[in-house]
């Protein structure tokens, strides 16, 4: 059992016998009212999304999920096929099932992902916390105002845009933190 105040993005709870993924959780406490947790939830079986407000003391059922290591095998249209690294079983997911990690999934990636199963059905895929990607396009370095942390826009091979340090050039390999939508960490070593 979890309480409402323990909810955070990535937590899975059971509502009406279905697993629901917490995509966003915002804790609010006002002086007059009790503390509340505003959440955005996604049904892992149907893809339906909703917003629910919980009291900090509400009791919620945990969901036990199975996890296996998998790698991206290939992409066909909006279907992403992942392969279990131990028994080589293939699993398919639609783009909408993995929309939170989609900006960092690209053909030919070698990252070992975590395939998430609910009752023997693949419902989601989680990327490692840090991934390495190649910068496909970025502007040249800015001259002059270089005191402090200077950032500029860059584009990855799959079209994802993010801000990188000013010294990063086209073709450089960068590290990306995949939590909370992904952010530049530094040049890959």
UniProtKB/Swiss-Prot annotation:
Entry keyword set: Cytoplasm, Elongation factor, Protein biosynthesis
Taxonomic placement: Bacteria, Pseudomonadati, Pseudomonadota, Gammaproteobacteria, Pseudomonadales
Superkingdom assignment: Bacteria
Pathway recorded for this protein: Protein biosynthesis; polypeptide chain elongation
Gene3D superfamilies: 2.30.30.30, Nucleic acid-binding proteins
Function in brief: Involved in peptide bond synthesis. Stimulates efficient translation and peptide-bond synthesis on native or reconstituted 70S ribosomes in vitro. Probably functions indirectly by altering the affinity of the ribosome for aminoacyl-tRNA, thus increasing their reactivity as acceptors for peptidyl transferase.
One Pfam short name: EFP_N
GO BP, sorted A to Z: peptide biosynthetic process
Protein name as annotated: Elongation factor P
Compartment(s): Cytoplasm
Cleaved signal peptide residues: none
GO cellular component assignments: cytoplasm
InterPro entries according to UniProt: Elong-fact-P_C, NA-bd_OB-fold, Rib_uL2_dom2, Transl_elong_fac_P/YeiP, Transl_elong_KOW-like, Transl_elong_P/YeiP_cen, Transl_elongation_fac_P, Translation_prot_SH3-like_sf
GO MF terms, alphabetically ordered: translation elongation factor activity
Family: Belongs to the elongation factor P family.
SMART domains reported in the protein's UniProt record: EFP, Elong-fact-P_C
């Amino acid at each position: 059992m979890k309480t409402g105040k323990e909810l955070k993005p990535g937590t899975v709870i059971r509502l009406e016998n279905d697993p629901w993924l917490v995509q966003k959780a915002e804790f609010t406490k006002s002086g007059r009212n009790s503390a509340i947790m505003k959440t955005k939830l996604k049904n892992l079986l149907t893809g339906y999304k909703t917003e629910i407000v919980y009291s900090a003391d509400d009791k919620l059922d945990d969901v036990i999920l199975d996890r296996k290591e998998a790698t991206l095998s290939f992409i066909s249209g909006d279907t992403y096929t992942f392969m279990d690294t131990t028994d080589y079983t293939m699993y398919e997911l639609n783009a909408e099932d993995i929309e939170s990690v989609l900006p960092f999934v690209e053909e030919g990636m070698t990252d070992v992902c975590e395939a998430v199963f609910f009752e023997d059905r693949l419902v989601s895929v989680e990327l490692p916390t840090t991934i390495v990607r190649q910068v496909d396009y970025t502007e040249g370095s800015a001259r002059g105002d270089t005191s402090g942390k200077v950032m500029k826009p860059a584009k990855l091979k799959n079209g994802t845009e993010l801000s990188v340090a000013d010294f990063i050039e086209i073709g450089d390999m960068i590290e990306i933190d995949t939590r909370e939508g992904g952010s530049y960490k530094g040049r890959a070593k």
